[in-house]
Amino acid sequence: MLLCVRLRSYHLRRKHNGNCAQSITLEISEFWTRGGVNLDISSRCTLACPNCARQSIADIPANLLSEAEFDTYLKHFDRFIFCGQISDPILHPKLDVFLSKIYAAGKMCSVHVAATHKPDAFYTKCFKAHPKSNWYFGIDGLPKDSHKYRVRQDGEKLFRLMLESRKYIAKSIWQYIIFKYNENDVDTAKALCIEHGLEMSLIKSNRWAKDDPLKPTSTDNYYIREQHE
């Protein structure tokens, strides 16, 4: 079973005393019995994706998961996912260290990235740190268009890094969320995956605001979120 650790809950446990901390501790009493964990390892992201949870959280507390804290997780879990709910794992300065430790322990890992504001050399260092890892690259549309949702992203740089990653890791996966601006480019993206030996993860979203200009035209390309009373 996989447990996702959200940064906000994590900070509540660390920051507050008394009843608040106690109640959260009780909620995660079975935390260490899980087989896998999804970690938000920092509070950092350089992108400004409109439908991201970051846009609705007024105060995101600054935090970096320390190496000592990570070592605690490493003792208890066999599978790690670095898929930030409000952060991008590539922006943690010790991501390569975490990956190296997971690999040395013979454990599995996947990494989800979309930010492009680190030097190429750091990405390569992280790729090399865990040769059996799987990486998901968030490029929503053709590389030249991905910034239309992934605001401030250099999609062409990330595509190039995705191709480079094939030399070092187990799987390089193109994660493609369907939007109005890219719904007609899916077949082209699939052809690029075949050409370059990539896997594709095609995602239909349900995070749509009323009259959302990013919402695909075709009803086959999105989900409708159920409304509950």
Residue spans for each PLM region:
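Aromatic-anchored helix/helix-loop segment that forms the rim or "lid"
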Residues: N221-E229
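Flexible glycine/acidic-rich beta-alpha junction loops that bind and position SAM and/or redox cofactors
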Residues: Y181, S201-Y222
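PLP-dependent aminotransferase class I/II
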Residues: W174, K190-E195, R225
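A glycine-centered beta->alpha junction motif in the catalytic cores
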Residues: I139-P143
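Conserved alpha-helical substructure of the radical SAM core
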Residues: L3-R6, Y10-N134, D145-E156, R160, ...
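Conserved strand-turn element in the central/C-terminal portion of the radical SAM core barrel
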Residues: M162-D185, S205-R207
